[in-house]
Design a protein with these regions (language model features):
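Active-site-adjacent beta-strand/loop module that shapes the phosphate/pyrophosphate-binding cleft
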Residues: 42, 72, 135-160
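Acidic, metal-coordinating catalytic segment for phosphate/diphosphate chemistry
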Residues: 19-72, 80
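Conserved Nudix-box catalytic region and its N-terminal flanking loop in Nudix hydrolases
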Residues: 51-127
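Short secondary-structure junctions
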Residues: 125-135
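Sterically constrained small-residue positions within well-ordered secondary structures
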Residues: 26-28, 57, 84, 130, ...
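Cytosolic, low-complexity regulatory segments enriched in Ser/Pro/Gly with interspersed Lys/Arg
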Residues: 1-21
Length: 160
């Protein structure tokens, strides 16, 4: 069902890939990943590609932010790559992204964001999943926010 839904979404939004022209190829490919659409209480209502979730008026979807602290209590912040499509070159938290509409990340909200965080910590910071899977993540709550980058790109997320 997911594959049919993705193919239908691509046909219905055939002009969206044009919005990615001129962007880094690997970043553009990640924009095809399926985010988890949620209602205002973080209840799952469907899935949609990252590009559709972040383009135009945006669509509310589940996300996460990881705050990493060292033994002295200092938080790691990172400057987002200038190749990022949304919010390039901006200073941000240690790691942020989205759980995807895949079995390991789309069932339980908290466990899903932990699995997604481990995946992205490896991809973005090079911290192996074999290391992060042993960590104890502390879920400190959720909040909803909207933040526009420019006329085209926006965030609208329930962030864990």
């Amino acid at each position: 069902m997911q594959e049919f839904s993705r193919q239908f979404d691509r046909m219905a939004n055939a002009d969206l890939p044009d919005k990615l022209e001129g962007h880094d190829q690997s970043q553009a490919e990640m924009m095809d990943e399926q985010c988890i659409l949620v209602g205002s209480n973080d209840q799952v209502i469907g899935s949609m590609s990252k590009v559709e979730c972040h383009f135009g008026q945006g669509n509310r979807h589940r996300a996460f932010s990881v705050l990493l602290f060292d033994s002295s209590g200092r938080m790691l912040v990172q400057k987002r790559s200038t190749e990022k499509i949304t919010f390039p070159g901006v200073w941000a938290n240690s790691c942020c992204s989205h759980p995807l509409d895949i079995p390991s990340e789309n069932s339980d909200p908290i466990q899903g964001v932990v699995k997604a965080a481990c995946r992205k910590l490896e991809q973005e910071l090079g911290i192996a999943i074999s290391v992060t899977s042993k960590w104890q993540f502390n879920h400190i709550g959720t909040f909803e926010y909207r933040c526009r980058w420019n006329d085209s790109w926006i965030e609208h997320e329930i962030d864990h």
